[in-house]
Amino acid sequence: MKIKDLIKNKALPSFCTANFDVIESIFYYCNINKLPCLIECTSNQVNQDGGYTSNTPKLFVNKINNLRKKIKLKQSQLFLGGDHLGPLPWKNNTNKIALKKSVKLINSFLNEKFDKIHVDTSIKCKNDKSINNEIIFDRTCKILSSTIIKKKINDKFLVIGTEVPLSGSNDDKKVIITSIKKIKIEALNFKNFLESLHLKKKNFWFSH
């Protein structure tokens, strides 16, 4: 089954970690209980430069597969995801450099057959005075419209967006619980924003 089918059928928890002791425990549990398993790594954990775990996507997948075989978890039970793929690891560079590296990052995940791709371009780069939904959307369009990405992304479970707090920690270091009312307001605002962009950028939507 594909990720969306599993979610629709019941639910599919995502374990976002690059810690192989944790992953080993998850594999054992899923194998014993015959459950599907989605393991995700973030762009600052695993990327083409190695990330803070010193793992490229290729190396990460090789380690995952070796561990899977050791525990005898079926290949059909395992799904891999890339989380917050975008400029996060290179936010201290200009947006031009960070986006170029983001394309290379996502392409490296696609080349290793990751099933779930989460594109997040909401991070402010070195030369960004501010960032808003329009900028985030334009950057996402540029990445997904890239020739090397466009041909490989269609059969993936694609997630676009960000979350609270921003990936990489909350800037003001405060823990805030978002109310249901605020979530509904933000969801409506984003829905209206997407509808307005749909009218302005039809070519992008119709080609994806």
Where are these regions (language model features)?
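Alpha/beta catalytic barrel-like cores
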Residues: 1-72, 76-77, 89
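Active-site mouth loops of central-metabolism enzymes
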Residues: 9-21, 81-103, 173-181
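Hydrophobic faces of well-ordered beta-strands that scaffold small-molecule active sites
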Residues: 11-17, 37-41, 76-84, 115-121, ...
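Glycine-rich anion/phosphate-binding loops
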Residues: 17-22, 51-63, 90-108, 135-143
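Active-site-proximal beta-alpha loop/turn segments in soluble metabolic enzymes
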Residues: 45-49, 84-92, 121-134, 157-181, ...
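Alpha-helix-loop-beta-strand connector modules within alpha/beta enzyme cores
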Residues: 54-82, 132-156
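Acidic, His- and aromatic-enriched active-site or binding-groove loops in soluble protein domains
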Residues: 136-147, 178-194
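Membrane-embedded hairpin module used as a gating/binding unit in multi-pass transport
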Residues: 163, 189-208
